[in-house]
């Protein structure tokens, strides 16, 4: 299965910057604490925690830092009264956008999310307005350089659902989200070194963006990710190589 414009299409990835990394770490720690508080500290019995651990390690968080976060959650961190909130909406060019938040104040969060949509020509939708276009999956990513057949055989043996090979040679292995950790363990044991592993929302359809709407979508994503309450942003925007070259 071939793919194209990987990072522009499935989930916007910005260049790593020190300030951005600090914000990413804060958000990952918040997710680790919440996942451990809600489901316990054993990643083998808590898929949400295992996914958060994989994401933390993919972002080079130290074991000491993530273990302290888990301990806070298991210990019933009194300061952590966060709840997961999912917002849905339409972005520039008719793109479907899902915004995953962890917040202790719904009013603040929805105000920030709505502002981002409004400023970029989109609109916040109701529950179910676009979620039917996305499927929750585990994604294990490999950098270019691996043989497709090697990864395919190992992935199928490990119980993965599918793999996607991109034009640049990068490979994504897709799993049921609850099986992400178990599949990754099997792939790790074969010697395949993953570049990242996370739970993601995968769109079933794509919305092609032109040179006018693509920058607006990227601005929407930037505004949303700048909110401390926003954990992840998913969309179905398709940005061609030709359009990307103009950005």
Curated annotation (Swiss-Prot):
It is found in: Cytoplasm. It comes from the Bacteria. Signal peptide: none annotated. Keywords: Cytoplasm, DNA-binding, Transcription, Transcription regulation. Belongs to the TACO1 family. Gene3D superfamilies: 1.10.10.200, 3.30.70.980. PANTHER family: TRANSCRIPTIONAL REGULATORY PROTEIN YEBC-RELATED, TRANSLATIONAL ACTIVATOR OF CYTOCHROME C OXIDASE 1. The keyword Cytoplasm applies. This is Probable transcriptional regulatory protein YPK_2146. GO terms for biological process: regulation of DNA-templated transcription. One of its GO terms (cellular component) is cytosol. One of its GO terms (molecular function) is DNA binding.
């Amino acid at each position: 299965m071939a793919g194209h414009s990987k990072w522009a299409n499935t989930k916007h990835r910005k260049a790593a910057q020190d300030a951005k990394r600090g914000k990413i770490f804060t958000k990952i720690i918040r997710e680790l604490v919440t996942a451990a508080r809600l489901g316990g500290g054993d990643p083998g019995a808590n898929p949400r925690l295992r996914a958060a651990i994989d994401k933390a390690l993919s972002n080079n968080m130290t074991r000491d830092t993530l273990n302290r976060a888990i301990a806070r959650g298991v210990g019933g961190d009194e300061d952590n009264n966060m709840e997961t909130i999912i917002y849905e909406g339409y972005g520039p060019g008719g793109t479907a956008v899902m915004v995953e938040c962890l917040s202790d104040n719904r009013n603040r969060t929805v105000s920030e999310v709505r502002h981002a949509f409004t400023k970029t020509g989109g609109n916040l939708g109701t529950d179910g307005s676009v979620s039917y276009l996305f499927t929750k999956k585990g994604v294990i990513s490999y950098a270019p350089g691996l043989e497709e057949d090697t990864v395919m055989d190992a992935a199928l043996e490990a119980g993965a659902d599918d793999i996607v090979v991109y034009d640049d040679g990068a490979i994504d292995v897709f799993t049921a989200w609850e099986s992400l950790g178990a599949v990754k363990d099997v792939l790790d044991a074969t010697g395949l070194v993953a570049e990242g592993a996370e739970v993601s929302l995968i769109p079933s359809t794509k919305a092609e963006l032109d040179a006018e709407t693509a920058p607006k979508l990227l601005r929407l994503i930037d505004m949303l990710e700048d909110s401390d309450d926003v954990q992840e942003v998913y969309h179905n925007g398709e940005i061609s190589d030709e359009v990307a070259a103009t950005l």
